Amino acid sequence: MTASDAADVYRSAIVCDMLLPYMYGADPAKYLTLERIRASGVSFVSITTAVDWHTLEETVHILARERAYLRAHSDQYVLAESAEDIMSAKRDGRLAIAFNVQGTNPLQSDLGMIEVLHRLGVRHMLLTYNQHNTVGGGGYEASDGGLGKFGRMVVREMNRVGMLVDLSHTGHRSCMEAFEIASAPLSFTHSNPLALWDNPRNIGDDMIRACAQSGGVVGVTGIGLHMGDNDASTEMICRQIDHIAGLVGPEHVGIGLSYVHDNVAFMADFNGHAAWAVAPDLAPRVSQSLSPAEYAFATPEQLLGLAEVMMRRGYDTEAIQNILGGNWVRVARRIWR
């Protein structure tokens, strides 16, 4: 197989990136990232519109602004509310976009807001964002009390309305309890194997297996500090894929790059919220000696090369195309409505 063969496989694939963070700011330069993603051959991306520190009012305003932008640029982008919207956008040469919320605090303990956010285009939501909230335990906490009563209600309501439950950033016990009560596939849209790198944001093999048993997908993230010594190379991304595919099969692996277009601005905003100011703990062995500008993130342009690396490692065309996005489309077909 040649690089040309890999390019053909990539061009014909439905390429999905399930996590583009930092889209809630008003900086117009961020939209250049969307154009880069579209130009790189990606078919679908899910953009973060709010995090656990946002209020419901802030979240709705952000969603309104992003929806207006998509309407004004409908020749390039389309709001994806169904799996068919993704397929249609691929045929039209447009980038399909859905929204995500990283954490459930923006609900402000109102279960009815899940359906409201769904109608505004939110297609997956994290239960927590590193810290405890009213739903469950965060992945950065020393202890995890599991899902509370409201947390169980949230999982069931998300299943009902057709919103993917995203367990990234969530504590172990809360994740496993969510798997027990869910009636639809659950996923980790941007999480890497703990077995490969000891980092509080990474997930254990038992969590990967539980995700696969639910019918879900683990999205490999391209954050260098979550893969090794600040290494965001394409080969390192494929190493994450190899581990997950070897454990549960390639049908349960996807991509959630979590690419940050402006490291310095992102980390300044992140650390401006005291409860979430945990950046030095992202990888204690490495990040203490790095400035935010030095944090490595895999870029959308690396995805074509990822297809080539997977081909060299023996993945067949079907597996490559499913990992690049077909597996996420399968989950969307089953959940989104």
Model regions: which residues?
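N-terminal hydrophobic targeting/anchoring segments and the immediately downstream early-domain regions
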Residues: 1-144, 149, 198-337
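Alpha-helix-loop-beta-strand connector modules within alpha/beta enzyme cores
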Residues: 68-72, 143-161, 178-188, 306
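Distinct, well-ordered alpha-helical segments
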Residues: 110-114, 171-184
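Ligand/cofactor pocket segment of small-molecule handling proteins
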Residues: 191
